[in-house]
């Protein structure tokens, strides 16, 4: 499996896919890793519909402005979340955390109250659901790249049409589509990214980043070894 820095730098959005299937064991591994994404209060609001049957991909294609890659890719994941769904499992989630040694039972009511107040009054739920679900989608995309598959994230679709075609409730938020498979063509050339000084500020907005912003690829071998050494030292018992 590729190192993470290589996965990030080599990932590209694929325009056209081969019809070759994604083996079940790899698909499940990718989905499992996506489910390990972090989320506020560990509420994991993301939900995924895995679409593989040709007729269902064609239905989805119609709801996504007839993008060719939806009909071509062997797997399309519909990423969505449901408003207020967290109320159905917040107790079980916190109880499981306590069972695993995360926190004390007597703290659960207070944490639950904090979470409920935040989700009901502190932030618009669609915004919160989008934030967390996209973390999981990004994790899924990088996991697929690490296993040697190609992906294409998509935001071009009609949410209402997707909900209607795939039986989602009205209070669902359809957040993204992700195609997974094998690219039919070589990756496009690297389109480049902003230098650090163009998107990173030092301590406050408007204060330039004080690095040279020259990094153009994954950390070199020396840097990778240094990071591994630091991680190893950190894990040593005191």
Model regions: which residues?
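Short beta->alpha linker loops
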Residues: 22, 55, 157-158
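Generic N-terminal amphipathic, Lys/Arg-enriched alpha-helix
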Residues: 4-20, 89-90
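C-terminal helix-cap and adjacent tail motif
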Residues: 6-7, 13-14, 176-238
């Amino acid at each position: 499996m590729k190192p993470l820095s290589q996965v990030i730098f080599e990932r590209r959005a694929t325009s056209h896919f081969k019809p070759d299937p994604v083996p079940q064991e790899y698909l499940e591994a990718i989905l499992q890793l996506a489910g390990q994404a972090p989320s506020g209060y560990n509420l994991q609001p993301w939900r995924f519909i895995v679409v593989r049957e040709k007729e269902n991909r064609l239905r989805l294609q119609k709801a996504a402005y007839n993008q060719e890659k939806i009909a071509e890719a062997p797997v399309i994941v519909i990423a969505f979340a449901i408003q207020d769904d967290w109320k159905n499992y917040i107790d079980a989630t916190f109880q499981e955390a306590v069972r695993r040694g995360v926190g004390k039972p007597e703290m659960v009511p207070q944490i639950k109250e904090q979470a409920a107040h935040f989700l009901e009054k502190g932030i618009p739920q669609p915004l919160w659901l989008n934030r967390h679900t996209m973390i999981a989608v990004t994790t899924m995309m990088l996991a697929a790249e690490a296993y040697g598959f190609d992906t294409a994230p998509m935001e071009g679709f009609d949410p209402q049409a997707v909900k209607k075609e795939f039986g989602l409730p009205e209070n669902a938020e359809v957040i993204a589509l992700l195609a997974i498979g094998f690219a039919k063509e070589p990756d496009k050339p690297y389109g480049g990214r902003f230098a650090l000084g163009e998107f990173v500020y030092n301590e406050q907005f408007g204060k330039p980043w004080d690095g040279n912003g020259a990094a153009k690829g994954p950390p070199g071998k020396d840097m990778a070894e240094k990071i591994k050494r630091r991680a190893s030292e950190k894990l040593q018992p005191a």
